[in-house]
Amino acid sequence: MARTVCGCSWALIFIIMSLLVKAKIDVCKRGDVTVQPSHVISLGSAVNISCSLKPRQGCLQVSSLNKLILYRFHRRIHFQRGHSLSSQVTGLPLGTTLFVCKLACSSKEEIRICGAEISVGVVPEQPQNVSCMQKGERGTVACSWDRGRDTHLYTAYTLQLNGPKNLTWQKQCSDYYCDSLDLGINLPPESPESSYTAQVTAINSLGTASSLPSTFTFLDVVRPLPPWDIRIKCVNASVSTCTLQWRDEGLVLLNRLRYRPVYSRSWNMVNATNAKGRHDLVDLKPFTEYEFQISSKPHLQKGRWSDWSESLRTQTPEKEPTGMLDVWYMKQHIDYKRQQISLFWKNLSLSEARGKILHYQVTLQEVAEGNATLQNITERNSWTWTIPRTGIWAAAVSAANSKGSSLPTRINIADLCGAGLLAPQQVSANPEGSDNLLVKWTSPGEGATAVQEYVVEWRELHLRGGMQPPLSWLRSPPYNTSTLISDNIKPYICYEIRVHALSGDQGGCSSIRGDLKHKAPLSGPHINAISEEKGSILISWDEIPAQEQMGCILHYRIYWKERDSDSQPQLCEIPYRVSPKSHPINSLQPRVTYVLWMTALTAAGESPQGNEREFCLQGKANWSTFVAPSICIAVITVGVFSMRCFRQKVFVLLLALRPQWCSREIPDPANSTWAKKYPIVEEKKQLSLDRLLADWPTPEEPEPLVINEVLPQVTPVFRRPHHPNWPGKGQRLQGRHASEEDTGSSASSPPPPRALTAETGPAVDLYKVLGSRRPDSKPGNPVSHLTVLPVDYLPTHEGYLPSNMDYLPSHEAPITDSLEELPQHISLSVFPSNSLHPLTFSCGEKLALDQLKMGCGSLML
């Protein structure tokens, strides 16, 4: 089986070679192309190219029809009719040029006859800078040189090395571009001063060139191997006593070391003679990662430096921290007794930390008392306490590593925004480039000279995931009124920026919101509640998630329209505020269903609308439309009713129009204790007017009351008699017991009934006329038996007389004396006399009080 496969392979190779030979032969079967003087010429030389046809290879055996054409690549340069063609070509460029001869028997077809390649080149230049090198003690010798310009021809380079004792080593380079050769021999270190000579020869078709001989010794050409097994050791873990160690070849006498912190670009260089693989370093920084490299040389003056060793990266030991922390704080009131103090500090730099910071020690102490001290140890860069609002407090923060602690940074806790005169003015924040935010402000006017330092702080405006956003700050000298924020800032995030001006323990501040980049929010606010309050609605909403706000929100818009309405919605634009997330709207009509939604706006545009909510205002109509008329009517009514005359007339009208069933029950004086003990005098007995006037002197304060009967023609008038014992206003009179005789006489002798007659004299208060006899009175002195009822005894002096009084005297003797009194007459001229029906009755034995009505000076029977 193996023999069969081998035989097939050889047969295939033979067939391929036969085809190639036949193709070679068949290329120029119609003619030949010759080149004179050579196929290889130097630059600028001329060449003669000839093309001839072989016998019986022309066009139909007629030579006049043969047209030979010479092409240079694909461009026609010469043609001639006949069996041959000859042309001289000059100005050929460097490199190889192809010429092709073709036969044209017609204008449509050309037959290839043969072709030739002409190479144009130059004589090789003399090789320069021949140098040889041997890598390590056991390496081989390799030499390199500069070839010079390109010959554009195949050029062979030969390296020859001659040594002591007529030793010669030679090697030729077969590559087209050859500039180095490895002889594959090792020069022994036993004879470091022995001389060697190297020479390079270049040969091509146009000529030969040789380099100058290069002579060297073993020390000149040997290049030690790079050091290896590099390590560093520090005694007692102290950075001040660190030793770098490595391994080298035995012939090395000189070393050079370079090292640097990994974050630095410049190297520190150190030379070490006869170091024997170790060197002490005294200027290393603590807790710093360094990169170390070492190179070697076999001789102080001669020889070559080895390549740099592989880098060793290691961290030096720690040392106690140096420097002080940059501490900042925030103060927030919780209630009237407590406040919250939040301390923040920045990390120390690597050069200041000098080790891994394990924790921070924080102390908060009341300055005045000195006994209230709070201490804590934390690994974070912030701490928060709740302390009383009274007293002056100070804080101290220090950092600690495994070797010790830094000096504490002490600050006094003051109101950072308490001094209004120190507040910076015209604060602005604008993007600067693509990654920076430029904050500018102006000095605080009168307090500018007192400013010792500016502090610019910024933090994300919105909480993410319920966590407090980190606080960042920068300090600026008092002569600067701008700063560039580039750390801890991201695009499409809104930041609250505050500028503090500090002067001792006082400070003033101003704030603004800013963003690095912004675009329209991705979603709108979510309305979570709509409530009705006093004829208006209160809309409450949830904040847009921070990752969807896409910058600082400038305004909110509330849209509303009637449900199922195609009209344009109304809107209300609200400036952004952190809290509360609610706003009233008082322009909605009651009992109309509205659809409401909200959007948010940044400087880049408006967000999509949020959720829709329907609401119908169920409150009463707008009460404000009734307030003004009600106030006017009330003022007019109060003004009119302040006039007594008008008030009395209106009251009488209301009494006349009032239905009988709603009449007020009037107390009956006849049922009183006084009426039972002291019955009224008999009506038929006539009182002697002369005796009555003699016994009644003029009262000190007469209070006449006119009682008018509402009749078309008759108005009875009663006159109040004067009596020295008449009680003052508001006093009660003690009744007198009547004798049995008078009582019996009154009951048994009723007078004949008669009508009341009008009287032109002054009116008398009817209730004050009513009286009783004294217990010691006699029939001959009836006037002395009368006791006047006070006006205050009745429920009201403007109401009716009691309706259930037993009787009134059916007639009264006329009183004609001119008494000193104050007449009062009220005319009901606003009502026609026939509007009220006159009361007609027949006088019987008694006149009941339920037939008599009194009010505002009028008596109606």
Swiss-Prot record:
Q: What does the comment on domains in this protein's record state? A: The WSXWS motif appears to be necessary for proper protein folding and thereby efficient intracellular transport and cell-surface receptor binding.
Q: Which family does it belong to?
A: Belongs to the type I cytokine receptor family. Type 2 subfamily.
Positions in the Extracellular compartment = 24-622
Family matches, as PANTHER family? INTERLEUKIN-27 RECEPTOR SUBUNIT ALPHA
> Which CDD domains would you find in this protein's record?
FN3
- Residues spanning the signal sequence: 1-23
Under which name does UniProt file this protein?
A: Interleukin-12 receptor subunit beta-2
The record's Gene3D superfamilies line, in alphabetical order, gives:
Immunoglobulins (2.60.40.10)
Membrane topology, Cytoplasmic segments? 644-861
Biological processes annotated in GO? cytokine-mediated signaling pathway; positive regulation of cell population proliferation
Where does it live in the cell? Answer: Membrane
Glycosylation sites per record: 48, 129, 166, 271, 347, 376, 480
Q: Start and end of every Fibronectin type-III domain? A: 126-224, 226-317, 318-415, 423-520, 521-620
Membrane topology term = Single-pass type I membrane protein
- PROSITE patterns from the xrefs? FN3, HEMATOPO_REC_L_F2
* Role, per record: Receptor for interleukin-12. This subunit is the signaling component coupling to the JAK2/STAT4 pathway.
Subunit? Heterodimer/heterooligomer; disulfide-linked. The functional high affinity IL12 receptor is composed of I12RB1 and IL12RB2. Il12RB2 binds JAK2 (via its N-terminal) through a membrane-proximal region of the cytoplasmic domain.
Q: Which UniProt keywords apply?
A: Disulfide bond, Glycoprotein, Membrane, Phosphoprotein, Receptor, Repeat, Signal, Transmembrane, Transmembrane helix
